[in-house]
From Swiss-Prot:
Free-text remark on how the cofactor is bound: Binds 2 magnesium ions per monomer.
PROSITE patterns: GLYCOSYL_HYDROL_F2_1, GLYCOSYL_HYDROL_F2_2
Alphabetized Pfam families for the sequence: Bgal_small_N, Glyco_hydro_2, Glyco_hydro_2_C, Glyco_hydro_2_N, LacZ_4
Protein name per its UniProtKB record: Beta-galactosidase
Organism, as annotated: Enterobacter cloacae
Amino acid sequence: MSDTPSLTLSALLARRDWENPVVTQWNRLAAHAPLHSWRNEPSARDDAGSARRQTLNGLWRFSYFTAPEQVPQAWVTEDCADAVAMPVPSNWQMQGFDTPIYTNVTYPIPVNPPFVPQENPTGCYSLTFEVDDAWLQSGQTRIIFDGVNSAFHLWCNGQWIGYSQDSRLPAEFDLSAALRPGQNRLAVMVLRWCDGSYLEDQDMWRMSGIFRDVTLLHKPETQIADYHVVTDLNAELDRAVLKVDVTLAGAGFADGEVVFTLWRKGEKCASVSRQPGSAIVDERGSWAERLTVTIPVETPALWSAETPELYRLTMALLNPQGEVLEIEACDVGFRRVEISNGLLKLNGKPLLIRGVNRHEHHSENGQVMDEATMRRDIETMKQHSFNAVRCSHYPNHPLWYQLCDRYGLYVVDEANIETHGMVPMSRLADDPRWLPAMSERVTRMVQRDRNHPSIIIWSLGNESGHGANHDALYRWLKTTDPTRPVQYEGGGANTAATDIVCPMYARVDRDQPFPAVPKWSIKKWIGMPDETRPLILCEYAHAMGNSFGGFAKYWQAFRSHPRLQGGFVWDWVDQALTKRDEDGNTFWAYGGDFGDKPNDRQFCLNGLVFPDRTPHPALYEAHGPQQFFTFTRVSTSPLVIEVQSGYLFRHTDNEVLNWTVARDGDVLVAGEVTLAMVPEGTQRLEIALPELNAGPGEVWLNVEVRQPRATPWSPAAIAAAGSSGRFRLRSLLLRQPRRRAAVLTQTDRILEIAHRQQRWQFDRASGNLTQWWRNGVETLLSPLTDNVSRAPLDNDIGVSEATKIDPNAWVERWKAAGMYDLTPRVLHCEAEQHAGEVVVTTQHVLEYRGKALFLSRKVWRIDEQGVLHGDIQVDMASDIPEPARIGLSVHLAETPENVRWLGLGPHENYPDRKLAAQQGRWTLPLEAMHTPYIFPTENGLRCDTRELVVGMHQLNGHFHFSVSRYSQQQLRETTHHHLLREEPGCWLNLDAFHMGVGGDDSWSPSVSPEFILQTRQLRYTFSWQQNP
């Protein structure tokens, strides 16, 4: 839609374009590849700045209104008296205006498409700027808005220029006729809601404003309007043809010539020129303004995420005198994407997608993404074995794709379409009135991004059901770009609108037979009749808070079933926003913290990294199963380890394998071997072991691959994609020498045992160890008690929408059974003096409303060394849900500086999330033992521990543990991490059993059966001593 006469503000408002799904723009220029109009070839070749691009980022003037009708007519030509400075790009909600709203599924406005509320927050921006006088003499001056949420009208010097919507793709307008010498004034009226908001119901914060770059671009009268590159490889991949289609514009294009030059590392590879005019395409002739060239390339360096080899293509438009009018340029990656034999392949090899979903989110800047944050995201992803990213759920900032090209990441580029809150979800997708809007969101994305080699898959959007509009857009995509597959999950991931079976949150082995959209287990799915497509999970492993359990199980399936080709973890970063409390201190806020209604509370906290991009423990776990190296013990005598490279295209030219053999964490022997493997190759290593019978303890072999030299995405000596493995070699026990006997003293109220400088006190009324003195100093702040519950995880809560409670969720079952309100009752508490030791036996029943849920029998033995030995048996009622844990809890008086342990570490790990942890002897500061999840939950566990030292306390056995300044009760009752208050001493939780955290999703019970207590009786032992 174009060439509409200039209208008054009141006339534009009366027309209400923002409530008409057929109207998506007025006067917006056609979509195209990014343009720069360089003046010389070296600048274009080197991707230097272009003098014909002028940024308008900076401080604009801004006035806020609660509805567009409140904007005065005079604002079009002059600022309002209350105008303030507003940074561009930014979201105005992050600058103190209006309220950010977080919802997952629920629309933030009443559902009545295409209409939006009368109260429609409106931001009025203005900027005074100047342009080069030469720009006014000839050529075309455009303005490019890379992202405005959600719709806007544009004026220049009081003249209405046009209108646009679609928050995530550029809106470009021709300003030439409106510009004048000296100062010029832009006015942009941005509406928070428009009919397009019904297509933008993504799981994210709903914010507004000019949140991406604003740029002026000057083009000559005769110009390159667009270009499209395609690389074609022969079967042997040793010869390629670069095909380039160019579209020219302007009155004189017919007399022009385009010179194409292909560069690699600054050196010219090939050059060819062509005049405009295509081959005849139909009975009416040819495209006069188009031209096509093909450039053969011998032995091309191929692009992949592992080897992001890039060429540079420059396209110089010359006038009849041979003078350069302008040059456009882009990176070129030679690669072939295809689906054949049921497999997604790149350059002939089946891919294994180590992917993650990524929202554009910044805790302080909202949806504004700067280059440094983009680079940090990519570098962190690659350092943790990720090779792919899904742009969930909209086209990203244009710089993102260039960085993915250059660093090496496979990209799923996704259209800005989601109608999750509609009932049914497919309501708009099956309505032809919404086809134009949906179509522009797909076609314009492709026209902007199709030259990027990193983009290997197009996506039609997310969670919008399945309708005829999807089928139409799928066919357009397959016709326009046959070089890439298309994926779309809506309608059950099994429709004709997708080349890939791409379900979300399908389980490895368990079916979810939902009506109309069943989710079969992924192993079953690829074996369904007539199903020949690859399966790649568009979302899986929901990393909400303390989650990500069972991730390794997916990777066991991916590695053993070729057509299970990986997936995209949900998701990259916790979508929390920085907020200040009443005292001016900053904290990370989630849904509802801004008074936003509706909201879905902490459901925005699903990241592998915190908002500041520091890692969650789950990131390390992702690092492990999807690593590029796997290790197999081939034989034990001699000890031979085989290393398998998962690189498809890279030789191991920067990898060394470090190995250590350690007894109880103490290194016995170590070595290093340079790896020299071809892609997908193997290498065997024989390790000469020392004599292992010389002492007690467990002996482990740890292996790890490191990269000695720095890479573009990692520093030197980093663990190569976290590639590590561990193998138990031997376990022996040590007998302790005999020393002085412990002495028992009894009264009606207490049992007291003394051994040298130590005294233990058991209270007969409670049956608990209530105090432990050393040198007369109390070391306990609470009794040692049974512990069967945990501060609920998000996965335990099992609520995907804050207004709904799932009675099948673990926490609801535990609450109903009374596990958070147990009353212990002592049945037995007696002690006996033996020759060298004292034995205390106790028996407790843990009751809820008079019903016995647990029976705990304990035998405490204090031996000649002053060591407390515990032998505990716990029996459970047959009709109660399986508990979160079985163990003990105590509040220690000491606040140690460090915690030391022998077991899995160093980071937090849980029974179903411990593959990336290493066996070793670890030391961490006490504060590092706590994981600061924004929504407080159970955290900080370390598994498979054999020795623990917390200050003077040393515990031995085989157990899991956590040490924290915060009690489980405080964690359970606190809504935000910054509200936690450190308690004196520290809390020690000692677990014989701890249920997995789950994570297949966060709204249904997802802990695998093997990580749920399978027996109704559990016995465990440990020893505890205090060291001077």
